[in-house]
Amino acid sequence: MESYIKHGDCLKVMKDIPDKSIDMILCDLPYGTTQCKWDVVIPFDKLWEQYCRVAKDNAAIVLFGAEPFSSRLRLSNLQMYKYDWIWDKVKGTGFLNAKKQPLRNHEVICVFYKSQCTYNPQMTSGQRKVSYRRKGLQTDVYGQADEDYIYDSAARYPRSIQVFSADTQKCSLHPTQKPIALLEYLIRTYTNDYDIVLDNCMGSGSTCIAAQNTNRKYIGIESEESIFNTAKDRIKMNKTQLQLF
């Protein structure tokens, strides 16, 4: 399957995607928290019907959210819901209510899957490796502990809170635009080279660009024509730049 983007209602367009052909779904769904025309929550029952049909059994379904939408999202499929990432956006929002409640500088990223998904932890640098021997301990929870310990901290496993600054100062094309670096991080975590990533609410095309940058294939869907055209031009330009370098 080749990469492509399409303008239209995602629930209708997804019907043309073959069964169990998608390796990852990465989407910033409408939260339904604004008066914007496009910010209408997609019916969860119809959404999951298509997600479960097109996604492979080991595909990660990774969806952005914020309260109260994120709670509704988890409850819409508790059987497949596994855990959350927390995206620290660095810059706070909600200044109009700053005297009534704390500024919001994070969003959640909910992870769903049927069976164990591809997981490539993105390691970071740590301290030097240390090996040592320690007397075994008897614990109430785990019983007798092993006596030999190897502390290998040259690389650190990722934690659930990830810090990525927004792209708004570089390129702001959509009100809810997500940083390409964060999308690349998630794509590398849950897919391998040449896997297919679906974004059924692609907005200005950031997920598709992140897929291009990480050597993955993509399918992007957008209902708003003007936003779709922006995404189309942006994706084409990024592809051209990648071919030059």
Feature locations, PLM:
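Core catalytic lobe of class I
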Residues: 1-229
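Short, conserved SAM-binding/catalytic segment
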Residues: 232-245
